[in-house]
């Protein structure tokens, strides 16, 4: 049986992965845009919010760490269905726990399910997206991440509207959870099986043990860690914005209720625009040059967000922040996938490093902010994005002689 997709199958596969990226962004913005409401409903301080985020972050890291084994055993298709349903249930529990039960434990359980599901999904959908990019032969991974950002833009907009209309978090989150579950089921039937999409022909298929060996081997390669530094700084900046930009706007600067969701939306718009149109720029100027320019933009934007004396300047800072943090993660994933023979293993390893920062960083910021203030804490992000820019040379494309040689078939 040939492992070749028809044009129609490929288009449906690509559309399904676009939709999955969008749903992931939508789910994160649903939580992030309602953090002030959840905090008020449960009467939490920043450290307690940070503790809830820590529960989500730990669960996410567990999900990320186990996802390569799941992909090796069952393929991404089934794994993505299960994990999307998990975080759909999780985001619904967060809403119910915040306003219906007024229970921190229920919210924490919801965030753990949400974190585990989203963490696992992030690795799987990026493995699928890099496989699509390899088949297309051009830089398209930023466009997939643009759909994630588009999901956060729309999610933040819905969150701002819900906050303005004083819609309870329970109603808002339940509707979003149901929508995500529908997307998961529809996409399951559009994503091809592992054998059709990603595996070699039956005679060349690897055992599960061989797949795990290749996956673990990526962790012994220095380039994986250098790419990880690039991704870590930008992922920390993106995750910090998703979870703290709303509170930084409303409580750090003291602006009106609802302006936090607006700042998150502005950040997400900046990120989305660059991800949509950034691919051709990368193909023309190269990954390294683009990453260095964006690191300067991110550092400048975060500084302006922290120091801006009025709302318009703070929003300009949020936009620059989003623009600068836009391509660090997807270009890191593309760099990890330069060698098709080891793409899945290296993408999984790089994604793990990036998502540890993306999901584990915000709780750390929360705890630190209790001692030095939220806006002062964001200076940490400036240092991290500068480090990301300095290490961006690791993302240069591999030469042909640096790639794994294709196996020769015996006659």
Question: Could you say what each language-model-derived stretch is?
Answer:
Residues 22, 102-121, 313-326:
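Hydrophobic core of transmembrane alpha-helices in multi-pass small-molecule transporters
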Residues 85-101, 297-309:
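C-terminal ends and interior cores of transmembrane alpha-helices
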Residues 77-80, 84, 107, 291:
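Primarily marks hydrophobic transmembrane alpha-helices of the MFS/SLC 12-helix fold
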